[in-house]
Amino acid sequence: MKQGVTNMQNILIVVDMQNDFIDGALGTKEAAAIVPKVEEKIRNFDGKVFFTRDTHETYYLETQEGKNLPVPHCIRGTDGWQIREELDALRKTEPIDKETFGSIDLAGELTMIDEDEGIGSITLVGLCTDICVISNALLIKASLPEVPICVDATCCAGVTPESHENVLKAMEACQIRIIR
């Protein structure tokens, strides 16, 4: 956190709000239910908004992730890879494509913003709480340990409701504030 800066940026990270995670190959009713909440959060957020986009290639099933989760999803260029239309319409910057759960590029971008302008807080929302949200939250926490980080649980969904709740507790243990 940049010392002595009074007008620091607040940042919202919208994690993987893509069709395949909402109502496609890996979609759930819980994921579909948060779309309006995420849309409202973006519309009302006073600060910079970044989107991540899970991005796989046609050879996904040959990758480590594909061997452990043999469900092709978020294949570059497909409808499932696209950010949900009503959310994408609110996007002002290019999404940060990531080949795995967490984005080192995102953490690096945030570190540069903090060094240049200062970051007041970072809030994460999106999918899936128990995979990509926690992965990005912990990467960001490791990169910016003095910046307050929170996850809005009302704008997240996990693979299951149980895994969603479990991972919220894990993030709290790592000093990530959970908004319920």
State where each predicted segment sits.
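Active-site acidic carboxylates
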Residues: 2-95, 116, 150, 159, ...
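Histidine-anchored nucleotide/phosphate-binding helix
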Residues: 37-42, 134-144
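Active-site beta-loop-alpha junctions enriched in small/polar residues
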Residues: 54, 101, 154-156
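Short, conserved acidic/polar surface loops in the N-terminal third of protein domains
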Residues: 60-64, 106-109, 135
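Internal catalytic-core helix/loop-beta-alpha segment
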Residues: 77-131
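Conserved strand-to-helix beginnings and helix N-cap segments that scaffold or border functional pockets
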Residues: 107, 134-137, 161-165
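A short glycine-rich beta-strand->turn/loop micro-motif centered on a GG-aromatic cluster
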Residues: 123-127, 146-161
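Short amphipathic alpha-helical surface patches that serve as generic macromolecular interface elements
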Residues: 133-137, 150-153, 168
